[in-house]
């Protein structure tokens, strides 16, 4: 597939197409991925964040990964929805805090690193004016776990 086809797939299909394109780029199957350098960086950081969570299994870890993926999907749209992305990021941090050995700062570092955003943006959503909404989202995350 050409780079242009992958670009169109990402615009339509979001994260799964980006994942596929990034993997093909890493294998050398496509040469130019300048349009998705943001994705390449995001996936690299996401992989680092998952490693930071260790080999812990279970629902909270799966929820952290799912919420980070959700936030990345919101951020990757042609018109990114940062409000929904940050809400998903807050839920990821709250789920991460439930994991053994993890605290808020480590979770903020992992999630912010995976998303390529400043952890203060997520912290502000958790504690600032958007904190009430973030708290509600955290409760919803608790119900899923």
From Swiss-Prot:
Transmembrane segments: none annotated. Coiled coil: none annotated. The keyword Oxidoreductase does not apply. GO terms for molecular function: DNA binding. One of its GO terms (cellular component) is virion component. It is found in: Virion. Disulfide bonds join 96-107. Keywords: Disulfide bond, DNA-binding, Virion. Self-assembles to form a helical, filamentous nucleocapsid. Together with capsid protein 2, wraps arounds the DNA and maintains it in an A-form. Capsid proteins probably maintain the DNA in A-form by non-specific desolvation and specific coordination of the DNA phosphate groups by positively charged residues. This certainly protects the viral DNA under conditions such as the extreme desiccation of its host. Heterodimer composed of major capsid protein 1 and major capsid protein 2. This is Major capsid protein 2. It comes from Pyrobaculum filamentous virus 1 (PFV1).
């Amino acid at each position: 597939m050409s780079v242009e086809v992958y670009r169109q797939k990402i615009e339509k299909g979001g994260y799964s197409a980006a994942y596929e394109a990034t993997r093909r780029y890493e294998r050398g199957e496509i040469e130019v991925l300048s349009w998705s350098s943001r994705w390449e960086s995001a996936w690299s950081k996401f992989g680092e964040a998952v490693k930071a969570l260790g080999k812990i299994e279970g629902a909270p870890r799966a929820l952290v990964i799912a919420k980070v993926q959700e936030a990345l999907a919101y951020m990757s749209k042609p018109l990114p929805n940062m409000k929904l992305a940050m809400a998903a990021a807050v839920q990821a941090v709250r789920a991460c805090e439930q994991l053994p050995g993890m605290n808020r700062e480590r979770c903020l570092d992992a999630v912010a690193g995976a998303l390529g955003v400043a952890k203060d943006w997520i912290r502000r959503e958790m504690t600032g004016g958007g904190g009430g909404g973030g708290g509600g989202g955290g409760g919803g995350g608790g119900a899923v776990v």
